Amino acid sequence: MADLASRITKPDEVAAETPAETPAETAPAASGELGQADGNIEDLGGSGLQEPEWDVEVSLSELQNNEATPFHSATTWQDLGLREDLLKGLLSLNFLKPSKVQGKSLPLMLSDPPRNMLAQSQSGTGKTAAFVTAILSRVDFSKPDQPQALALAPSRELARQIEGVINAIGRFVENKKVAAAIPGVLPRGEPVRASVIVGTPGTVMDIIRRRQLDISQLRVLVLDEADNMLDQQGLGDQCLKVKNMLPKEIQVLLFSATFPENVMKYAGKFAPNAHSLKLQRSELTVKGISQMFIDCPDDNMKYDILCKLYGLMTIGQSVIFVKTRDSASEIERRMVADGHKVSALHAAFDGAERDNLLTKFRQGENKVLITTNVLARGIDVSSVSMVINYDIPMKGRGDTEPDAETYLHRIGRTGRFGRVGVSISFVYDKKSFDALSKIAEMYGIDLVKLDTEDWDEAEERVKEVIKKNRAQASYAPSATEPKAAAGA
């Protein structure tokens, strides 16, 4: 296996290269073609989302028995036969046409009789909007108090985000009721009166056992970040217990950016006879993210280098990923003491604090967030221009092997919706160096080394990418903030 040195692109080589995608090429021309984008609709066209260059590979289980069975991909929302109130909601968010993943997955998810689905696609390609549209299409809103759809997420932050997307896309749906089944929200003993429930597996399992949630008419179950939930022993057990409590005919939809082979096999049993949308490993990493690394002299020097990067972090917004809660809190304490404005967010905070911290970050009140893997997956803040891997993600007993999937999810917090972004990973010893080397080899990443001996050049290199990110801000669709009406 090639070591990290063979994956490194020297800075002078980068400067000499012509970028594969310039901002002008990435940003669609104003051609009148409808697309998913924010900003002035008259000036924008195309998708605006991170669109894979590959055509989505769709494996249809029925083709095993009948090779002539056709399937189609929607090119407009109207092709899907969606309700007018859903169309209105999608258009109000500038989701003007389906992304590739949405166009491939929605006809399959909405087919009758309902079929299970396992869908894999890069971060920022519109997976959440896809399964939310499917959920809202399956629910009978003439029965607003009857639970009919259940979405599970690995963290309260992601559950809250999905809840927000449901409310945004369904903003024009009459009698829509959505409930969050996360710790500290639902009154104990009171029945859940909502047609759509979004929650974490443990809380959902508890309210089913306490008979607060009527599961008799649930039609669809969604697992977002499904590989993470099915692979973790605790979450996987909870998800399986929840599924076994639900009606046997329920439609199961599994979504994630990554599906390791061992999880894929289990997912196939969790959602049998499923349609499958899959990516090749080489297409998993997001090309719009400039992936860099810094070789720190030792573990203690990582903090000093982090502080030197602070000015770059606040050009846009940044997320710093660390291994432990204690590390997050300690780095926050030291940076605040050194005069930097940062916030830490991890699972040791109570639910209300976590909700408040993430809201402030979304609104731009906090520019820099220090966190653990609790925010590695699914969280969508389109203005994040930089991700820092203060600690390389590891897994296995004793952290013996690199966690390549978590690395991919972490850096996917930037480069959202086709915008560019920067990820910077800190290495300081042979173990961290080798771990990043293996991740780079696995995904075919060409890493750029930032020279700490010449900070001016390093800063210019990072700043160039971040400014491109900000220049593309008008191309980022928001699933929670509608475009302001003309003249508003």
UniProtKB/Swiss-Prot annotation:
Q: Where does ATP bind?
A: S121, Q122, S123, G124, T125, G126, K127, T128
Reactions mediated catalytically:
ATP + H2O = ADP + phosphate + H(+)
**Which CDD domains does the record cross-reference, listed alphabetically?**
DEADc_DDX19_DDX25, SF2_C_DEAD
Keyword Repeat attributed: no
Region annotated Disordered sits at 1-49
Q: Name one GO cellular component term.
A: cytoplasm
Question: InterPro entries recorded for this chain?
Answer: DEAD/DEAH_box_helicase_dom (IPR011545), Helicase_ATP-bd (IPR014001), Helicase_C-like (IPR001650), P-loop_NTPase (IPR027417), RNA-helicase_DEAD-box_CS (IPR000629), RNA_helicase_DEAD_Q_motif (IPR014014)
The record's similarity note reads: Belongs to the DEAD box helicase family. DDX19/DBP5 subfamily.
Q: State the annotated membrane topology for this chain.
A: Peripheral membrane protein
The record's comment about this protein's domains reads: The Q motif is unique to and characteristic of the DEAD box family of RNA helicases and controls ATP binding and hydrolysis.
Q: What does this protein do?
A: ATP-dependent RNA helicase associated with the nuclear pore complex and essential for mRNA export from the nucleus. May participate in a terminal step of mRNA export through the removal of proteins that accompany mRNA through the nucleopore complex. May also be involved in early transcription.
What is the species listed in this Swiss-Prot or TrEMBL entry?
Answer: Gibberella zeae (strain ATCC MYA-4620 / CBS 123657 / FGSC 9075 / NRRL 31084 / PH-1) (Wheat head blight fungus)
Q: What is this protein called?
A: ATP-dependent RNA helicase DBP5
Chain span(s) of sequence motif Q motif? 75-103
Gene name of this polypeptide: DBP5
Where are the coiled-coil regions?
A: none
Recite the UniProt keywords alphabetically: ATP-binding, Cytoplasm, Helicase, Hydrolase, Membrane, mRNA transport, Nuclear pore complex, Nucleotide-binding, Nucleus, Protein transport, RNA-binding, Translocation, Transport
Return the Pfam families for the record.
DEAD, Helicase_C
Assembly and partners are described as:
Associates with the nuclear pore complex.
